[in-house]
Swiss-Prot record:
Residues 165-205 are annotated as: Disordered. This is Cdc42 effector protein 3. Pfam families: BORG_CEP, PBD. Residues 31-45 form the CRIB domain. Keywords: Cell shape, Cytoplasm, Cytoskeleton, Membrane, Phosphoprotein. GO terms for cellular component: actin cytoskeleton; cytoplasm; endomembrane system; plasma membrane. Interacts with RHOQ and CDC42, in a GTP-dependent manner, and with SEPT7. The modification Phosphoserine is found at S89, S108, S144.
Length: 254
């Protein structure tokens, strides 16, 4: 039986000119049973793309069918079907006109359509933007280490030059032949070059680099602790516990 068909509870032989009251027409059978978890998940208002939320993938990309978008579709101003619209009554750019009263209770519901039907809305990109900047690429520890490295290189070069000159002077003073002095100078310079090549290169960079890496590590740990602290700073106060009252009663009885 259609729902619009009225059900008359009283006899039809009523007095002429007397109309049926609403309570005489309605019956408990017309009241539907509970629908369970029924929610208003899709809404398309008269304003078109400015008054819509929920899963509108049933349009299959034909967004020009929305009210108020026919002229934009013909002029080519209507955006593509992958654009993500979010109904928010607080934004002035999206709602220049009077928004629908339904949207006041649907701020967190996104407009989903097409390939974005399984995507979740972004969570406060403004607040996380500054946090993500702190996790950028770590700078190389070069500023505080360059003077130390240059000093060590200068010391090694000066040692090599002084050793070669000193050996050359002693060889010229002690020996009378130029061949012996040249051989002594070459042998001494080769021995110094071998010693300098045997020096570990890690000694030049170990201590300054380690201290700078420790600083960068502490900075990253501090930024990460700030982020986790802001995310985990939610505390719920559920009021006094019932266990405290029970313990107080037990103490009084003792």
């Amino acid at each position: 039986m259609p729902a619009k068909t009225p059900i008359y509870l009283k006899a039809a032989n009523n007095k002429k000119g007397k109309k049926f009251k609403l309570r005489d027409i309605l019956s408990p059978d017309m009241i539907s049973p509970p629908l369970g978890d029924f929610r208003h998940t899709i809404h398309i208002g008269k304003e078109g793309q400015h008054d819509v939320f929920g899963d509108i993938s049933f349009l299959q990309g034909n967004y020009e069918l929305l009210p108020g978008n026919q002229e934009k579709a013909h002029s080519g101003q209507f955006p593509g079907h992958n654009d993500f619209f979010r109904a928010n009554s607080t934004s002035d750019s999206m709602f220049t006109e009077t928004p629908s009263p339904v949207l006041k209770n649907a701020i967190s519901l996104p407009t989903i359509g097409g390939s974005q039907a399984l995507m979740l809305p972004l969570l406060s990109p403004v607040t996380f933007h500054s946090k993500q900047e702190s996790f950028g690429r770590p700078k190389l520890p070069r500023l505080s280490c360059e003077p130390v490295m240059e000093e060590k290189v200068q010391e090694q070069s000066s040692l090599l030059e002084n050793g070669a000159v000193h050996q050359g002077d002693t060889s010229w003073g002690s020996s009378g032949s130029g061949s012996q002095s040249s051989q002594g100078r070459d042998s001494h310079s080769s021995s110094l070059s071998e010693q300098s090549s045997d020096w570990p290169a890690d000694d030049m960079f170990e201590h300054p680099a380690s201290c700078e890496l420790v600083k960068s590590k502490t900075k990253s740990e501090e930024s990460f602790s700030d982020l986790t602290g802001s995310l985990l700073s939610l505390q719920l106060d559920l009021g006094p516990s019932l266990l405290d009252e029970v313990l107080n009663v037990m103490d009084k009885n003792k």
